[in-house]
């Protein structure tokens, strides 16, 4: 089962709150074999009320990026079809909805299936 520090997820949610009403996008660093998220990775992205996107050219070339986190300011933390396409690139994916906190953050697999993670 994937795990992460609750404070790390809360930090990502705080950043999402700061971008509101625009969507916010960041990435998770960690260890895919141990299924642990260890850091938030901030990279230059384009943010708007409708979407958040990033140029693949700015992503690290190694395997330290294991997941993504983004916000849905509309209060819905379910993935869109575009989200599901994006999820295929990462082992773990998160969507936070307003109000932004760990409790309103849903986690998804590469297949777009909702999963439970352990917050420690």
Task: Label the predicted regions.
Residues 1-65, 74-120:
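Conserved beta-strand-loop surface patch within small alpha/beta domains used
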């Amino acid at each position: 089962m994937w795990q992460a520090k609750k404070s790390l997820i809360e930090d990502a949610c705080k950043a999402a709150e700061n971008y509101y009403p625009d969507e916010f996008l960041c990435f998770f660093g960690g260890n895919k074999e141990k299924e642990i998220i260890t850091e938030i990775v901030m990279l230059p992205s384009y943010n708007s009320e409708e979407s958040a996107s990033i140029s693949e050219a700015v992503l690290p070339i190694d395997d330290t990026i294991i997941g993504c986190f983004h916000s849905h300011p509309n209060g819905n933390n379910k993935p869109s079809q575009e989200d599901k396409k994006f999820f295929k690139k990462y082992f773990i994916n998160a969507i936070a909805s307003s109000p932004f906190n760990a409790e309103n953050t849903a986690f998804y697999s590469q297949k777009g299936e909702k999963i439970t993670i352990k917050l420690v």
